[in-house]
Amino acid sequence: MANNDFLFTSESVSEGHPDKVADQISDAILDAIFTQDPNARVAAETLCNTGLVVLAGEITTTANVDYIQVARDTIRHIGYDNTEYGIDYKGCAVLVAYDKQSPDIAQGVDRSSEDYLNQGAGDQGLMFGYACDETPDLMPAPIWYAHRLVQRQSELRKDGRLPWLRPDAKSQVTFRYVDGRPAEVDTVVLSTQHSPEISQASIREAVIEDIIKPSFPEGLITPKTKFLVNPTGRFVIGGPQGDCGLTGRKIIVDTYGGACPHGGGAFSGKDPSKVDRSAAYAARYVAKNVVAAGLARQCQVQVSYAIGVAEPINITVYTEGTGVIPDEQIAKLVREHFDLRPKGIVNMLDLLRPIYTKTAAYGHFGRSEPEFSWEATDKAAALKQGA
């Protein structure tokens, strides 16, 4: 972003949002398969509607997985355990319609053990990674705080402090930037599903005092900050009953909240041979290490691939004028220190593990849990020394 004064907005959604229900089921299927068969090829898509879950896509695996039970367990964990919520893990219908991966794709992706590192990309495409110094996790402030809000909503729902909360929720945060830096929160929107008996006045007070204000450090919320809580006035019907949920519908929530471009490929349900996912994780890893090394305040990385070809077509670094050395020099360091071939990424980030269900809600980036290996800054020292 240019160094000037402006407003910028990002949104997030809770784990109970219908599209996120679908994402979590898809990644839970992937994890269940990877627990038995880490070399599986998985493209698991999910649709969820009132009382119905449809599982479809392409899976090639030796694993024996009860897909219906995985879907039910995921819905239960999210909190849809009552027919009043529109979907109930015990009684919903689950339809399974998986095919195997196309052999035309497999011949370009699979390699012999002797040619292991030259596994081709599972598809063509372009991916972006981004990092900046606006938050401790080197994420843009609007999306980082938007995630904190819906995480807080989930926490207060699950621990019973606000028992009238239901699983579906959305947040939106608008920051005022001064000289290109986040200075204060201009507007917070938080819509949360709730039980029918609670008054709107009680919802507004609890959301502002118990969810919004504790989610921000002192100084960001000012007397001028606007709070919009359940602006429609009522949010009883939600989740898959309110809207049909589909895997891959929240790609901006999953990434950087619109602060940088997006290549268009979704993440959830895909094994790491799909560069839509693995290369986007690697691009974040690169960008975060560049910023952690002090080589730039902001870093955007683009990589692109051709199906069946291992080497990326391009690796492009853009620091928006914040770099301490030229962008071309940073890109050269990236090529020296990061193996961005698909199998190189899998090895570098240890991606053949059942780690993906956690990624499917509250963002794939800016997370501190140990599963998120692409959030490590272990290459920063080498980049700094090389510069």
Curated annotation (Swiss-Prot):
Binding site for ATP: 17, 168-170, 234-235, 243, 249-250, 266, 270
One GO cellular component term noted in the UniProt record for this chain: cytoplasm
Entry note: cofactor: Binds 2 divalent ions per subunit. Binds 1 potassium ion per subunit.
Residue positions binding Mg(2+): 19
Pfam annotation, one family: S-AdoMet_synt_C
InterPro entries membership: ADOMET_SYNTHASE_CS, S-AdoMet_synt_C, S-AdoMet_synt_central, S-AdoMet_synt_N, S-AdoMet_synthetase, S-AdoMet_synthetase_sfam
Molecular function, one GO term: ATP binding
Name under which the protein is recorded: S-adenosylmethionine synthase
Higher taxonomy: Bacteria, Pseudomonadati, Pseudomonadota, Betaproteobacteria, Burkholderiales
Name of the gene this protein is made from: metK
